[in-house]
Structures are given as structure tokens and as C-alpha cells.
């Protein structure tokens, strides 16, 4: 009975002690992040760095509408295909939109020379002025300028390009022509023209009365002489003949001279260009809506300040960098491991060793105390604020460094440049892989550092308490300390703010420590006596049992006993 009382007394003394635990915040967040060493680490807070949403719409870019080519493409718009008349008034735009299967390009069959380079030039143009470079009525007095073709029909009638003139003989002659234009627009001027290649000598004579015709075009930066290639060809768009289309950019103050004895498709209108670095050309089936954005992709517009996106590599405006990642999330909080909180006889709660506290909501790190006046949480505001400031600055720095927003347009290649296009794709893929790898590695490293940083802060807080309490309390192995003295709320606050008075509680702690140690020693002595008694009693019972069995077996003849003297 005495032993039982001593054990209960010891249990009461041990459990009734005042305690203080060091812990960290936990919540019901479902956020997870990856680190260098772990995947899907549950955390209390994190920020997403990867935009994966768009609205599926074409929008105005910073309030400026795009130029929608509709059923026309760049060729049809610039040459002036009669089916593209609605585009003639176009003056300015934020970007240009083509559809994947635009029908109306060059209505008369032929090749547009260096077309891909022209598209590249137009991708940086945000406005133009269409003007009459060679007035129709006065520029070609000795030639007929009303050439039309069924291939460029409009409303059921033969027609021709709105920006070019098909010059043919006047009467029976095609006298040599010479005409020039001086660029006085103060900006680059896009000049377009063509050369007709008949299918036979008879057609050549019929149109130009000159079997040895040529076309010459010259400026400071351009100088070419063309001769018609007369040959039989398969019929395309009801035509055996072909027209090749050419262009050049005329610098301010420069002069362009046209000279021909036949076959010239002369410029009628030209374009003075104004460049804008955020412009571009996209190919998209998305429809236009009344909306505004600062970043447009062929899939839809993006309104995001995040540094990365995985929606589309082609972007126009202030856009996040495209990467192939599916997840880029940076941790800003702590590991989220809510402890299994239970209330025992005295309402005990564990410290950081057994997980975080959902009950502490006003800080990242802090304390839980328990004494005669009750229990409660208190955040350590200083360490929490320092951590928040450090992590916020780090996240902002990462976003600022990686958030170089820009336009990324596709490069143009013609059908004869497939090897170059394939090589370019491989190079672009290589750069994209590097960007993706760098972005993912950066996030993984920073996540690892942040979580280690939090672990260190909790450990420092624990060491701070330990260095104050010394032997006035004992570590009980779960992030908590058990006082050897009574510690009221004022005492607890002094531990938290670093002003704990160790000498004040030393004597009481010493007495209680000795008392607990004495109870432990006495209970150990009682346990030893009980153990010896139990062993002896068990042995006697065993011997008596063996004797009884032997006597029974001897009496019924199952066992014979012989005693030899």
C-alpha cells in the first residue's frame, strides 16, 4: 500500500508541474511545394509563380484594338486583294491577327519573294499611313493601267489588287518607262511591286509588244533587274501565267527608281510605317471581345503579374516568360504538420517535436504555457516579423529578377528553309529547356532554404528559453520544459520576453528537484523489495507444485522412486 501511494505521489508531482512549450503555427492549408530533397511538402503558406489560366479571348492590348485580318492574310492585305477591301482603312493596331486557314492572299498565282522577312518586319509595326506613291492618272501617260483578271474577281467582275497597277501597252506600243519617288515621309516606306511572267510569247506580245522586256528597280539599298520567264505552266486559279511579288523598305530621304520595257506590276499605294516594340503577329481562331489586357497569346489573353506562364510560347505585350513547367510554387510559410492535440488529465500539449499548433494564429513561432492560472498561446512577434520580412524580400527579389516581361513572336521561314526552321526549333527548344530548368531549380533551392530557415528559427527560440531556465526546469523531450517551481503568468511572460529572473526561482527549484529525486529513489527501493518477494514466492509455488505432481505419480505407479543407501 505504501508503494502504491509513493508511485501516485510521484505521478502527481510530475504531471502537475507548470510547463512551457516552443512551437510553430499550423493551419488547414492544402498547399504543397517541392524542394531539392522532397516532393509535395505540406506548407502553411506559399505563392504561385506560374500562370496557367487565360480567358480564351482576343482583347485590346492596353486599350488599343488588334488588326483582325479575318479571311485575309498578310499578303492579301498588303497587295490589296479585292476581297480584303475592309482592311484598306486600317491605320493602327496593337497586334495583327491571322486565322490558321485564311483564304484570301495573292489572288493571281505566283511567289511573294522574301515574304517571311516582310512578316518579321511587320511584327514590330504598330501603325501605317497608306498613300498614293504613283498617282494612277498622271504617272503612266503612255501606258494602259487598267489591267484586270478573273482570278481577282470582285462581286462577279474581273478586278485587280487595290495597291498595284497592271501596266500594259497603249495602242500597239509599250514605250520604256521611268518613274521615281523620293521618300519625304520622315519614316520608312514599304514599297511593293510585281513582275508578270506570261505563259507564251504570244501572250507577251499581246500584252507588252516587246519580247525582250525587263524591269529594273533601284534605291540606295536595293538594286535588281528582272526579266520575264516565259514558259508553259500548269493552270492555277485559271491562269497559266504567274506574278512574282517584291518589296523593299525605303529609308527617309532615299529615292526609288522604276524602269521597265514591259511586265511591270507597278506600285500604286505604298505604306509609311511606324514601329511599336510591343506589336506582333499571331495566328489564332479565338474571337474578339470587349476586354482589355496587357498580354495576349493565340490561346487567349493573360492578366497576371506572375513571372512565368505555361500557356503558349508566342506572346505579345508585357507577358510572363514561357516555361514547360506544370508547377512553380514558392513557400512563404512553414511546414504544415498539425499536431494531434489531445487533452489529458491536466490538458497537456506537446511542442514542436510533435508538429505545429493550429491554435496559434497571430504568429509563425511562439509558446504554449500551462500553469495554475490556465493555459494559452503567445506568438513571438519579433522572430515572426523578422522571418516575414526576410521571406517577403526574397520572394519579391526572385519575382523581380525573373519577371522580365516581353513579346515573343514566332520566326518566319519559307518552304525552302525547312532545315533552317528545324534547326531554329531545336535551338529554341534548347533555350526553353534551359529556362524551364533554371526556373524549377531556383524554386526548389529557395523552398529548401526557406524551410531550413524556419527550422533554425524554432531551434533558436528553443535555445533561448533553455539558456534562461537552466536547471530551474527540465527538458521533457517534445519541445517543452517542465518547471521545478511555480511559474505564474507574469513568470511565463518573463520567459517569453527574455527577462526571466533565474536566481529568484533557484531555491524553490532546488528543493522541488530534491523532493522529486527522493520520491523516485524511495519508489525504486520499494519496487526492488516487491520484485524480490515476488521472485521467492513464485519459486516456492513452483517447488510445491512439482512435489505434488511427483507424489501423485508415485502413488498410482506412474513413477517409481528408489532410494539407495
Swiss-Prot record:
Covalent lipidation (S-palmitoyl cysteine), chain numbering: 554, 561, 564
Q: How does it sit in the membrane?
A: Single-pass type I membrane protein
**Compartments it resides in:** Virion membrane; Host apical cell membrane
Q: What are the residue positions of the site described as Cleavage?
A: 343-344
Source domain of life: Viruses
Query: Glycosylation: which residues?
Result: 27-28, 73, 142, 285, 497
Q: Ranges in the Cytoplasmic compartment?
A: 550-565
Disulfide-bond pairs as recorded: 21-480, 59-291, 72-84, 107-152, 295-319, 487-491
| Molecular function terms from GO | host cell surface receptor binding
Q: Which UniProt keywords apply?
A: Clathrin- and caveolin-independent endocytosis of virus by host, Clathrin-mediated endocytosis of virus by host, Disulfide bond, Fusion of virus membrane with host endosomal membrane, Fusion of virus membrane with host membrane, Glycoprotein, Hemagglutinin, Host cell membrane, Host membrane, Host-virus interaction, Lipoprotein, Membrane, Palmitate, Signal, Transmembrane, Transmembrane helix, Viral attachment to host cell, Viral envelope protein, Viral penetration into host cytoplasm, Virion, Virus endocytosis by host, Virus entry into host cell
Q: Which residues lie on this side of the membrane: Extracellular?
A: 18-528
Q: Gene Ontology cellular component?
A: host cell plasma membrane; membrane; viral envelope; virion membrane
Q: Which residues cross the membrane?
A: 529-549
Any Pfam family = Hemagglutinin
Principal location listed in the UniProt entry:
virion
Q: Which residues form the signal peptide?
A: 1-17
Q: How is it modified after translation?
A: Palmitoylated.
According to its UniProt entry, the protein's GO biological process terms are: clathrin-dependent endocytosis of virus by host cell; fusion of virus membrane with host endosome membrane; fusion of virus membrane with host plasma membrane; viral budding from plasma membrane; virion attachment to host cell
Extra remark: Major glycoprotein, comprises over 80% of the envelope proteins present in virus particle. The extent of infection into host organism is determined by HA. Influenza viruses bud from the apical surface of polarized epithelial cells (e.g. bronchial epithelial cells) into lumen of lungs and are therefore usually pneumotropic. The reason is that HA is cleaved by tryptase clara which is restricted to lungs. However, HAs of H5 and H7 pantropic avian viruses subtypes can be cleaved by furin and subtilisin-type enzymes, allowing the virus to grow in other organs than lungs.
Quaternary assembly: Homotrimer of disulfide-linked HA1-HA2. Interacts with human CACNA1C.
User: What is the stated purpose of this protein?
Assistant: Binds to sialic acid-containing receptors on the cell surface, bringing about the attachment of the virus particle to the cell. This attachment induces virion internalization of about two third of the virus particles through clathrin-dependent endocytosis and about one third through a clathrin- and caveolin-independent pathway. Plays a major role in the determination of host range restriction and virulence. Class I viral fusion protein.
Concerning its family, UniProt says:
Belongs to the influenza viruses hemagglutinin family.
Q: What is this protein called?
A: Hemagglutinin
Q: Write down the species.
A: Influenza A virus (strain A/Wilson-Smith/1933 H1N1) (Influenza A virus (strain A/WS/1933 H1N1))
Taxonomic lineage? Viruses, Riboviria, Orthornavirae, Negarnaviricota, Polyploviricotina
Amino acid at each position: 500500500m505504501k508503494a502504491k501511494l509513493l508511485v501516485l505521489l510521484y505521478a502527481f508531482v510530475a504531471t502537475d508541474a507548470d510547463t512551457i512549450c516552443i512551437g510553430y503555427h499550423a493551419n488547414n492549408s492544402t498547399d504543397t511545394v517541392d524542394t531539392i530533397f522532397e516532393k509535395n511538402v505540406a506548407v502553411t503558406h506559399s505563392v504561385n509563380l506560374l500562370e496557367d489560366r487565360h480567358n480564351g479571348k482576343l482583347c485590346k492590348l492596353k486599350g488599343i484594338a488588334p488588326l483582325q485580318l479575318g479571311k485575309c492574310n498578310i499578303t492579301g492585305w498588303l497587295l490589296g486583294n479585292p476581297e480584303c477591301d475592309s482592311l484598306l482603312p486600317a491605320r493602327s493596331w496593337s497586334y495583327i491577327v491571322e486565322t490558321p486557314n485564311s483564304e484570301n492572299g495573292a489572288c493571281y498565282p505566283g511567289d511573294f519573294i522574301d515574304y517571311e522577312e516582310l512578316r518579321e518586319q511587320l511584327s514590330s509595326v504598330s501603325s501605317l499611313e497608306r498613300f498614293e506613291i504613283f498617282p494612277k492618272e498622271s504617272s503612266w501617260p503612255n501606258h494602259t493601267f487598267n489591267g484586270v483578271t478573273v482570278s481577282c474577281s470582285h462581286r462577279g467582275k474581273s478586278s485587280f489588287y487595290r495597291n498595284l497597277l497592271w501596266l500594259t501597252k497603249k495602242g500597239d506600243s509599250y514605250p520604256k518607262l521611268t518613274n521615281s519617288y523620293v521618300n519625304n515621309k520622315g519614316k520608312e516606306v514599304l514599297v511593293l511591286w510585281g513582275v508578270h511572267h506570261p505563259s507564251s510569247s504570244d501572250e507577251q506580245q499581246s500584252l507588252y509588244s516587246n519580247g525582250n522586256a525587263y524591269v529594273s528597280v533601284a534605291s540606295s539599298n536595293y538594286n535588281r533587274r528582272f526579266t520575264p520567264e516565259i514558259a508553259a505552266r500548269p493552270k492555277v486559279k485559271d491562269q497559266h501565267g504567274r506574278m512574282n511579288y517584291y518589296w523593299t523598305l525605303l529609308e527617309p530621304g532615299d529615292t526609288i527608281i522604276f524602269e521597265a520595257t514591259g511586265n511591270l506590276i507597278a506600285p500604286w499605294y505604298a505604306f509609311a510605317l511606324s514601329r511599336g516594340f510591343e506589336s506582333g503577329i499571331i495566328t489564332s481562331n479565338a474571337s474578339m471581345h470587349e476586354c482589355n489586357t496587357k498580354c495576349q497569346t493565340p490561346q487567349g489573353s493573360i492578366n497576371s503579374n506572375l513571372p512565368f506562364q505555361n500557356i503558349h510560347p508566342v506572346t505579345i505585350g508585357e507577358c510572363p516568360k514561357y516555361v514547360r513547367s506544370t508547377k512553380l510554387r514558392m513557400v512563404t510559410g512553414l511546414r504544415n504538420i498539425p499536431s494531434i492535440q489531445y487533452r489529458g488529465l491536466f490538458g497537456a500539449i506537446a511542442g514542436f517535436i510533435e508538429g505545429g499548433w493550429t491554435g496559434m494564429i497571430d504568429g509563425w513561432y511562439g509558446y504554449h504555457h500551462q500553469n495554475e492560472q490556465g493555459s494559452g498561446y503567445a506568438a513571438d512577434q519579433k522572430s515572426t516579423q523578422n522571418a516575414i520580412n526576410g521571406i517577403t524580400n526574397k520572394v519579391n527579389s526572385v519575382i523581380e529578377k525573373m519577371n522580365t516581361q516581353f513579346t515573343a513572336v514566332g520566326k518566319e521561314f519559307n518552304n525552302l528553309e525547312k532545315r533552317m526552321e528545324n534547326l531554329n526549333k531545336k535551338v529554341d527548344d534548347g533555350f526553353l529547356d534551359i529556362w524551364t530548368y533554371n526556373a524549377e531549380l531556383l524554386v526548389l533551392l529557395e523552398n529548401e532554404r526557406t524551410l531550413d530557415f524556419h527550422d533554425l528559427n524554432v531551434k533558436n527560440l528553443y535555445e533561448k528559453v533553455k539558456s534562461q531556465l537552466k536547471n530551474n526546469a527540465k527538458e521533457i523531450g517534445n519541445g517543452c520544459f517542465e518547471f521545478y517551481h511555480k511559474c505564474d503568468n507574469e513568470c511565463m511572460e518573463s520567459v517569453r520576453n527574455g527577462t526571466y529572473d533565474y536566481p529568484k526561482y533557484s531555491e524553490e527549484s532546488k528543493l522541488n528537484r530534491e523532493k522529486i529525486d527522493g520520491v523516485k529513489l524511495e519508489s525504486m527501493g520499494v519496487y526492488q523489495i516487491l520484485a524480490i518477494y515476488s521472485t521467492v514466492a513464485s519459486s516456492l509455488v513452483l517447488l510445491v507444485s512439482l512435489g505434488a505432481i511427483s507424489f501423485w505419480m508415485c502413488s498410482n505407479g506412474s513413477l517409481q522412486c528408489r532410494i539407495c543407501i
